[in-house]
Amino acid sequence: TFDIVGTYKFRDASVLAHMNTLTYNPDTNLLYTTNAMVDGHRITTIDADTMSIGNTITIPERVFNLAYDKKTNQFISIVPIDATMRRINYYNSQFQLILSKDIDAHHDNYNNNGAFATDGETIFATLSTVVTVDKTGNVTKISSFPKNLEIEDMDMRHNIMYTAVNSNHKVFIYSMLNY
């Protein structure tokens, strides 16, 4: 089941407005989110126990969708360059840039949602595809889904990928069993 375990209201729009990505670092016990609509260089931390807003981290590169890879201890950001190209930025746990890789998402729209990373692999969504990038920064898989569904973010549990999907202002949780 999908139960609400707490409701938190944040009023600082400059920090948390339009936060469409959320990732967790178990080593710091912090959630990390971005607000690219206001400042595309800003990352905000939230304490996972208290849900209090923490520090704001500003980095030189734009950051849109963000994932933490607990196996490599790296943050990964997926940033649209143009309608088809995305820049994958790899950061250490202190948000120092390690590597950037430009990839062709084979999609004709800037929209870029969701991010998941594990053991060097990165998964993100465009408006109608899910894209997998391997450890070397090469696209290894692109899977289509209906255009009327918009994946907002994703995570994995017991080797099943779950996605939060926006459809006509309603949110649905989908599982992708064969991903």
Sequence positions of predicted segments:
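Blade-loop segments of beta-propeller domains
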Residues: D3-N35
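Repeated scaffold domains used in trafficking and secretory/extracellular systems
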Residues: S14-T23, I59-K70, H106-A117, K147-H158
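Conserved beta-strand positions in repeat-built beta-propeller and related beta-rich domains
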Residues: L31-D39, S77-A83, I123-S128, T163-H169
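Loop/turn-rich, solvent-exposed surfaces of beta-rich toroidal or solenoidal domains
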Residues: A105-V133
